[in-house]
């Protein structure tokens, strides 16, 4: 060994270092909170507050105006605000909610796991000048998609929409 080289770690030190690194990784992912439990997410799940908090759930609820500059055209929509509220409420009861970490998280949940019956939904074909759907096809949803994003330092419910049967 010369004055510029470092001593090489033995196998036990390498294994110990890898084990410690794995433990840190597990601990950090275990500490991530379920998105649905975060106060700012719960606040943003209120469709009337969502747009002002940076989300776009109103882009997926028939009868509500989407955020400025967006449209419901070519989007899937809940048939009513009540269907949207039910989809969010039922997400509170699933046993495997996504944990918020990084910058965004997404989860698709079947209606069966949400303990919801079949729900009618719309596929928007045309919208007015404000982006509100004016012509649609009706379909039966099979799943609900939940999208969470870190916005201005706070987690929010960014999107929530029905997924059609194939």
Identify what each model region corresponds to.
Residues 1-10:
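N-terminal secretory signal peptides that target proteins for export/translocation
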Residues 15-26:
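Bacterial N-terminal signal peptides
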Residues 28-32:
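Sec/Tat signal peptide C-region and signal peptidase I cleavage site
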Residues 33-39:
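Cleaved targeting-peptide boundary
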Residues 34, 45-166:
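Functional cores of ribonucleases/endoribonucleases
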């Amino acid at each position: 060994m010369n004055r510029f080289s470092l001593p090489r770690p033995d196998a036990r030190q390498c294994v110990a270092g890898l084990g410690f690194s794995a433990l840190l990784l597990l601990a950090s992912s275990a500490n991530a909170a379920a998105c649905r439990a975060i106060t700012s997410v719960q606040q943003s799940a209120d469709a009337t507050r969502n747009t002002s908090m940076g989300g776009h759930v109103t882009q997926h609820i028939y009868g509500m105006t989407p955020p400025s500059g967006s449209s419901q055209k070519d989007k899937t929509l809940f048939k009513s605000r009540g269907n949207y509220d039910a989809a969010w409420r039922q997400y509170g009861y699933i046993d495997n909610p996504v944990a918020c970490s990084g910058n965004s998280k997404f989860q698709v949940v079947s209606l069966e796991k949400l303990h919801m019956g079949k729900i009618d939904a719309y596929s928007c074909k045309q919208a007015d000048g404000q982006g509100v759907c004016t012509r649609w096809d009706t379909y039966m949803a099979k799943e609900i998609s939940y999208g969470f994003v870190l916005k201005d330092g706070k987690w929010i419910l960014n999107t929530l929409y029905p997924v059609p049967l194939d």
